[in-house]
Amino acid sequence: MKKPKVYYMRLKKMLVQLKQMQTELEQMHDEVEERYDNLSENRKYSDFGYEMEEAIDNLYNAYSDELDSLIDYIDEAANGIKG
């Protein structure tokens, strides 16, 4: 059986990777919002524009919430191993 330290280190490595993913997701969301802001007024305020903005926000929020939960869960597990 592997020592708890091995599992702890693997979980911490996973945390770093997940936090990097979270940062990348935030950057992508910012880029997409910037592109949305640069749409013409006609497109931005059309049904297409409203639906696009809502879809972008919903997708970002769903991924962000799941990543936050996963990070919290793994952090809790790592701290439980560390004792």
Predicted regions: what they are:
Residues M1-G83:
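Long, low-complexity or tandemly repetitive, helically biased scaffold regions used
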